[in-house]
Amino acid sequence: MIYVIDHNDSFTHNVVHQLALFDKVECDNYNKVSEKKIKQASTIVFSPGPGSPKNYPITSKIYKKFKGKKKMIGICLGFQHILFCEGAKIIEQKKIYHGYQSNIQVVNNKSLFQKGKIFKVGRYHSLKLKEPFKSNNFEITMRCLNSKVAMAFENKKEKIYGFQFHPESFLTINGNVLIKKILSA
């Protein structure tokens, strides 16, 4: 079972729909999380949402408690939140990307995806990872071709993955392939 933690975002319903193609999905609001469901889940997904990771201390507690015990995936705010919990600074971008399609490229040969591969993805974010960023076992694996902003990370050892973009968006080509690969890792 996949347990989605919803950060009050309309995209969460699309995320749930996409994940349901691969497994049973349960979804609860971040302030009504069920520890019983977390324990039953094979994967925890931190959804997109408004604001900054610092606005969701409950999500930080969940991440820290289950890190290394459950596979985790962060999407958009969820991507930022995982990195924030790992000590990263999340900052405003000069340009806001809401409903914007970008080309991103796999830049790391340790990635689950083939280095050099290019994907078209849907972006809906005004914040980004401030770099350089270093944390044990975390590798930036995809970047925007134009801006070089980090678009994905992987921590294979602890099975923690993140996408700054929205794999469930109609702007993302082959989003199901990306999710399936992460879920099967």
Where does each model-flagged region fall?
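Cysteine-nucleophile active-site neighborhood
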Residues: 43-111, 120, 179
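Short, charged N-terminal beta->alpha structural module
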Residues: 2-21
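Acyltransferase
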Residues: 167-185
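A short, well-structured beta->alpha microelement
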Residues: 20-37
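Short amphipathic alpha-helix with an adjacent loop that forms part of the alpha/beta core around
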Residues: 33-41, 133-134
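Catalytic beta-strand/loop cores that center a nucleophilic Ser/Cys/Thr
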Residues: 110-158
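Active-site environment of divalent metal-dependent phosphoester hydrolases
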Residues: 11, 127-130, 169-171
